[in-house]
């Protein structure tokens, strides 16, 4: 189905969902050496020699952070620059430092070499990973990204904030909903809340209800927002999507153009505070529109109910 993450502003990161090999060791025997200068949170200056890359994974922690260590099932917010090293030439493929300094969420399975490089690293670290084809996209490469099966990838990653796979809102409980709106009941720690639909008709307009009030900063349009969520259909109460079920927080830029999320999210989450749990009751016009979603069994007339936990909101490169 068309998930909340309908658009990836960073297609190469979206393409790194390959089987991971795990581990946190590094191998510095790859030659010739890549050098990096610059400070954490700023665009790195990367020097790649005009020679062929080595055949082994090379990992170097350029800046040692003192935050939470990245666990295998965690997601994290970070900035990155990716270079393509092809033969004796190289070029920049993507950089969040070059696109307004907006960090992105690393979630799900990473390229094997990138996973090896990052697992166990502490937040606040800058990590260099020189990834040979066998620990990157393999012999098939990625034609859409312009990566051949013989190309080496050079990543420089600034690790900002760690999010556990079962992270939830941390604020003060203020409501369970109800009074004509769905009732929301918290589940076991780290699991999605349950949503019970009322018997009446849904509201005609977008409706928000704060269930847990966080004390963090307010979400502003243009922020990178990290959330957990569960979505259900008002008509029958069926759940059609849940980040908790995947144990994978979701990150997006709110108010982006083109939109990365449905309209009801862009409008309903701005102004809400980090640490909050918010219920969004979203009419069709602010959701999937008249076409709905066949795969998710959402009709064009369906009102959707989301319970969203706001884990973080970030406006710049260093969070």
Positions of the model-derived regions?
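Cross-family detector of peptidyl-prolyl cis-trans isomerase
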Residues: 2-319
């Amino acid at each position: 189905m068309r998930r909340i993450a309908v658009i990836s502003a960073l297609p190469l990161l979206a393409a790194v969902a390959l089987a991971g090999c795990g581990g946190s060791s590094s191998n510095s025997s790859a030659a010739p050496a890549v050098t990096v200068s610059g400070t954490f949170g700023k665009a790195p200056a990367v020097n790649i020699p005009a020679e062929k890359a080595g055949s082994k994974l090379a990992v170097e922690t350029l800046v040692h952070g003192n935050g939470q260590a990245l666990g295998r099932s965690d997601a994290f917010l970070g900035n990155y620059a990716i270079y393509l090293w092809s033969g004796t030439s190289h070029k920049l493929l993507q950089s969040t430092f070059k696109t307004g300094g907006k960090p992105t969420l690393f979630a799900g399975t990473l390229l094997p070499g990138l996973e090896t490089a990052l697992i166990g690293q502490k937040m606040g670290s800058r990590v260099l990973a020189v990834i040979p084809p066998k620990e990157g996209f393999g012999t098939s490469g990625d034609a859409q990204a312009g990566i051949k099966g013989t190309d080496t990838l050079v990543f420089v990653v600034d690790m900002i904030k760690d999010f556990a796979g079962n992270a939830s809102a941390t604020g003060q409980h203020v409501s369970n909903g109800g009074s004509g709106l769905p009732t929301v009941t918290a589940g076991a720690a780290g699991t999605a809340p349950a949503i019970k639909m009322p018997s009446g008709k849904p509201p005609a307009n977008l409706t928000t209800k704060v269930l847990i009030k966080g004390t963090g900063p307010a979400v502003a349009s243009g922020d990178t927002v990290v959330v957990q969520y569960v979505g259900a259909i008002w008509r029958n109460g069926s759940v059609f999507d849940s980040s908790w079920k995947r144990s994978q927080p979701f990150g997006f830029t709110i108010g982006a153009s083109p939109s990365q999320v449905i309209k009801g999210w862009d409008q309903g989450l701005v102004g809400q505070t980090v640490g909050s749990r918010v219920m969004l009751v979203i009419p069709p016009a602010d959701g999937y529109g008249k076409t709905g979603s066949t795969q998710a069994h959402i009709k064009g007339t369906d009102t959707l109910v989301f319970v969203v936990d706001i884990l973080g909101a970030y406006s710049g490169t260093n969070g």
